């Protein structure tokens, strides 16, 4: 417990919070060749490799992930949600924040139905999360 005198002299330091998705909070100015701090909801990037990963201990699967080089120069691992995808090397994708709990190092999701990423086929429920259009009657 600090004394009143200590608080008057120094005051309390506010806690610093670490970002869950740091790649979204960094912008690159190619003219000045410098980085600026500005948050953005999504970022565009190019797939450098598309592969599968195995999840942590109690789970078992082959989860589809892509290594993406973003417009700010950072390279991140991002998850490809849904069943089936059309992504390959050099595909242009849009990523959003959001980690995958059982894949270490995967902090981002690829947005389905945006840019080169196709929507999930034959999806009836939760369509907005997978870029699927409303089916014709």
Swiss-Prot record:
Instruction: Identify the stretch(es) annotated as Disordered.
Output: 1-25
Transmembrane spans: none
What is this protein for, i.e. what is its function?
Answer: With S4 and S5 plays an important role in translational accuracy.
* Entry's Gene Ontology BP terms: translation
- The stretch of residues making up the signal peptide is none
Q: What's the protein here called? A: Small ribosomal subunit protein uS12
Q: Its family?
A: Belongs to the universal ribosomal protein uS12 family.
Presence of the UniProt keyword rRNA-binding in the record: yes
A GO molecular-function descriptor: tRNA binding
- Give the HAMAP family listed for this entry: Ribosomal_uS12_B
3-methylthioaspartic acid occurs at: 102
The organism encoding this protein is: Finegoldia magna (strain ATCC 29328 / DSM 20472 / WAL 2508)
Record key words, sorted: Methylation, Ribonucleoprotein, Ribosomal protein, RNA-binding, rRNA-binding, tRNA-binding
* InterPro entries hit by this protein: NA-bd_OB-fold (IPR012340), Ribosomal_uS12 (IPR006032), Ribosomal_uS12_bac (IPR005679)
CDD domains listed in its UniProt record:
Ribosomal_S12 (cd03368)
Q: Which SUPFAM superfamilies match?
A: Nucleic acid-binding proteins
How would you summarize the oligomeric state and partners of this protein? Answer: Part of the 30S ribosomal subunit. Contacts proteins S8 and S17. May interact with IF1 in the 30S initiation complex.
The organism's superkingdom is given as Bacteria
Q: Which PANTHER family match?
A: 30S RIBOSOMAL PROTEIN S12 FAMILY MEMBER
């Amino acid at each position: 417990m600090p004394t009143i005198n200590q608080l008057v002299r120094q005051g309390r330091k506010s806690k610093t919070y670490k970002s869950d998705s740091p790649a979204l909070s960094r912008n690159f100015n190619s003219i000045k060749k410098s980085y600026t701090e500005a948050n953005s909801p999504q970022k565009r990037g190019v797939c450098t490799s598309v592969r599968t990963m195995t999840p942590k201990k109690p789970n078992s699967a082959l989860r589809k992930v892509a290594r993406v080089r973003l417009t700010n120069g950072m390279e991140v691992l991002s998850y490809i949600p849904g069943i089936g995808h059309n992504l390959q090397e050099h595909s242009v994708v849009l990523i959003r924040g959001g980690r995958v709990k059982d894949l270490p190092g995967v902090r981002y999701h690829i947005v389905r139905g945006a840019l080169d990423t196709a929507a999930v086929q034959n999806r009836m429920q939760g369509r907005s999360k997978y870029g699927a259009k409303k089916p014709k009657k």
